[in-house]
């Protein structure tokens, strides 16, 4: 993160601390953002770190920790949301990508909309070739990230402990279904 570069961009776009109180304003209106999150491991701390970084930029931010961000997410009553997702609960990218990045996606709380992404999602929905599906998923991800509408902050490490009699229990960085048909106890 380039703090000085961010400050310069804000200034170039007309954001200044016109009254010397440390908070940027534009056209007389102070920049104040609300961050919502919930109590899952690492999220409150990440929200506080984000709040601190915004403060260093001259942006006032408050953090509200909720039981769940889902209702507020659907209503769109927030400025920034810090939440966690299991990205591939089905082992296939379509569900996650469509729900998160599709214009009408059920988890598209930021109201992201990109016609090119929607077209690629439409193609992904009917494509059966696994290589082409993987390529489409990568292209969708690249396009969304290039639009700067999402910021992935961290990946939570998961740990597993088991007896030495358990075989075939695989850990995945993108899934929570660890027990498969290959999992057994000797």
Report residues per predicted region:
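Bilobed "Venus flytrap"/periplasmic-binding protein-like clamshell domains
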Residues: 3-7, 13, 37-50
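Short, well-ordered beta-strand elements
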Residues: 30-39, 61-64, 79
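Generic hydrophobic alpha-helical scaffold/packing signal
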Residues: 7, 51, 55, 94, ...
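Short, solvent-exposed loop/beta-turn-alpha elements that line the ligand-binding surface or hinge
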Residues: 1-8, 18-31, 74-77, 96-126, ...
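Periplasmic binding protein-like
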Residues: 52-101
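Short, solvent-exposed loop/turn elements at domain surfaces
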Residues: 42-45, 91, 161-162
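Conserved structured core elements
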Residues: 41-44, 48, 111, 115, ...
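Bilobed periplasmic-binding protein-like "clamshell/Venus-flytrap" ligand-binding domains
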Residues: 13-37, 84, 128-163
């Amino acid at each position: 993160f380039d703090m000085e570069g961010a400050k310069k961009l804000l200034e170039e776009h007309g954001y200044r601390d016109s009254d010397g109180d440390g908070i940027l304003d534009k056209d007389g209106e102070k920049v104040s953002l609300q961050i919502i999150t919930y109590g899952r491991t690492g999220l409150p701390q990440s929200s506080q770190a984000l709040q601190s970084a915004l403060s260093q930029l001259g942006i006032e931010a408050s953090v509200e920790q909720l039981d769940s961000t889902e209702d507020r997410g659907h209503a769109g009553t927030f400025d920034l949301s810090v939440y966690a997702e299991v990205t591939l609960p089905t082992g296939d990218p379509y569900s996650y990508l469509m729900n998160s990045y599709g214009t009408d996606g059920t988890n598209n709380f930021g109201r992201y909309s990109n016609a090119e992404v929607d077209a690629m999602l439409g193609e992904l929905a009917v494509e059966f070739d696994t290589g082409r599906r993987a390529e489409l998923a990568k292209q969708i991800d690249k396009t969304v990230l290039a639009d700067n509408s999402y910021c992935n902050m961290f990946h939570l490490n998961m740990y597993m402990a088991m007896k030495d009699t358990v075989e075939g229990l695989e850990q995945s960085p993108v899934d929570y279904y660890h027990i498969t048909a290959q999992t057994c106890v000797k």
